[in-house]
Structures are given as C-alpha cells and as structure tokens.
C-alpha cells in the first residue's frame, strides 16, 4: 500500500453507474505530487494522511463487491512524519 | 484512478474480436505526455478531462463482462485545474 | 493500453509448457526504448505500431483461457504519428 | 517480488474492518527511499530485509482469503548485501 | 513480459508456507539494475537471460495453482543481444 495526503473531493459530471455510490477524493503522495483519485469508504477530510490499496484488492476494499476501483483508502494514519525527500511547502 | 485528458479517437486496422464493441481513445496525463489508449464507455470528446480506472477493475468498468481492457474511462471531470507541474502549451 | 512498435520475433530455448502455443514478439514504446515481450494473437510484423493490453486482461486477450501473459497485442494501428518526444532515428 | 527493508510499525487511527487482523509495516526499497506499507504475516522486526509480493498474489499471501493487500511480506532474507546503488547512510 | 538476467539464488530464512516449494532467483533488467526476485519453475542458472511474467498471470505460471508470485520466469532466451542502453560492465 502507498501513503497519500488527501487534497480535496473530486466532482465529476458524468460517472459510470457502477461508481455512483462512493465519494472520490483527489490524493497526492506529497504536496505538489501528481494527483490521483481514490475511492473513500472510510470518511477522510482534506489534509489527512491515508493508506491506499491498489491492484485488484482495491475493489473489495471499497466494501462493495465488484466496485470498479484501482485505488481505495483503507486507513487513516494517526501521525505521519513527512519523509525528508517530500515537499513540505504547503 | 488517474486523471487524463482526451486527445483523439484511435483508429486501428485490426483488433481482436473481443475488443470490437467499444470506442478506443488516445489519452494523456498532460499535454505532450505519453499517449495511452483507454476504452470509453462514457462518451467523451477531445479535450475532456477524465478519470480512468486501471488494473483488473478496468475490465468490468467497460460494462462488458470480460472485456480485455487495462484502462477504462469511468467519469468526466466537471472542472479540472491543470496542476502546476503540467505542460499547458497546447 | 499502451502503444508499442514491433521489433522482432523472440526466440526462447525453453518455455514453460503453458506458453508454447503463441508467438512472442519483442516490442518497444519507441525506437531504442526498453524491450518488452508481448504475446501476439493478431499476426503482426516488425515495424507495426500495436496496442498492447496488460494487467489481468492480457490473459484472456490471448484467446486462450488462462494463458500466462501480462502483455498481449490486441490491435494494429492503421496510421500512427510518432509523438514528438519519441526517438525517430531508426 | 521486490526486496525491502523494514522501517517500523505503522499506526493507523481508523482502518477498514477487513484490515484489522494483521500488522502493517512501513518498508522502503533502500534507506531514504519512498515509504510503502506492507502486510506482515511472517513476523518481522525493524532492519530486516524482506521479500514482498505485490499484485493480486499479495492477497492470498496474507494467509487470510480476500484480505485487501497489494503488498505482503512473504519471506525474510538471511543475508542481504545492499546493492552498490543503494544509500547506506543509516 | 520483461527480460531479465539471472543473478543468483536467493536464500531466505523464513518464508510463508505457501512459497516453500519453488526456487527464488535474484534477477535484474540489466547488470547493476535493481534486484528483483522471481520464482523459477524452468531451471535457470546465473547469467541466463530470461522472460518473466508479472501481474496475476505470474501465479499460474509457476505451475502451482494459487502460488503467491508476482514475477515468474516463463522462458529462457537463446541468444540475447544486450540493448545499447544497458550496462555491460560486469
């Protein structure tokens, strides 16, 4: 699993029907990193550091069998020290 | 899921039979980025910013059980601010 | 799916039995790029630009249930303009 | 499989229910490398060099059918010479 | 599939029970490249150039249903010319 910081909620105009039941969040490995989109079954808020599961396990981790996710939040980290190589400008 | 910009429709001379029922689009993570090919079950047009699902979930997300996709568009983003590190020259 | 150029046929001395029934081609994302090996159920020739499917979908895309592939050619592209960032020296 | 060095135990405030039964460790490919999170069914301690399995195989490797992992420790390496390109400052 | 050179046998002190029945080899994409660990159901020796299958197909390719592998050797290449960009110093 990788560690991401929650950036914000993602608003999409038109999703496939299978995706309609879960919030999608924009997450980044570090501030300024490439944005990715994760399914959030945990209930996170911007600024949280979270553990995300990818690969085929991301599907069941949503709690909905067969949900089409390749990145799902599976936990919130209590205290996370940003690694030295990460950007800490925000 | 990752975020891509739709570039154009991809025309292929000869596809395997399993792939014949869905449009294929060329998508890029940013203008000038490496082109990838995504299955489009949503109905996108060039210039749209879209959410794409990879891994094994890309298959069912096409809406056709067992479709051989490793990248499928699952949503169109309403408004997307291009991240600062992306190329915006086009 | 990603786009590759077919380089040549790959000859292997000793394959696992499950792999014996399909041709393997060396493909590259661009001239001079890292060589990868794709299963070819379509019938390609060197110089063709092809669409390759990875992940778990690469298996069924071979046309043989349970074939052990992680990269399978699923279509030949009619006309492909090499992106500007690609090496065109060959 | 890739080779990682165990850094420390990861404490998360709120995990999905499916993840509650196994310890999670922070692992890195080399000292100072990007931290990743692996499920540990073997029983490792900080400083151990371990083999981690990703992809869909990471799930069953936890020993719990359907566990939502994309990175699971599957073995401890007896003696591992750090490759020359790795950082050895710690 | 990717192409690797076999480096050496990997000795691990403690493996999960599911992994005990197959040899593990350290492989590299080129001399000096990052070491990875592949399951070897073919019978390779150090110096061999091999084809490795990843993703979910790596599991069945071991010949043991449900084996927890994400990288499995599926063939030995007869003659492999090292690409120009590879390090040939060893």
From Swiss-Prot, chains A, B, C, D, E:
Which GO terms fall under biological process for this protein? carbon fixation
Would you tell me the Gene Ontology cellular component terms? Answer: carboxysome
UniProt KW keywords? Bacterial microcompartment, Carbon dioxide fixation, Carboxysome
BMV domain: from which residue to which, for each copy? 1-78
Q: What is its main location?
A: other
List the Gene3D superfamilies hit by this protein, alphabetically: EutN/Ccml
Which cystines does this chain contain? none
Matching Pfam families, A to Z?
EutN_CcmL (PF03319)
Concerning its family, UniProt says:
Belongs to the CcmL/EutN family. CsoS4 subfamily.
Function, as annotated, reads: Probably forms vertices in the carboxysome, a polyhedral inclusion where RuBisCO (ribulose bisphosphate carboxylase, cbbL-cbbS) is sequestered. Has been modeled to induce curvature upon insertion into an otherwise flat hexagonal layer of major carboxysome subunits.
User: Under which name does UniProt file this protein?
Assistant: Carboxysome shell vertex protein CsoS4A
Encoding gene, per UniProt annotation: csoS4A
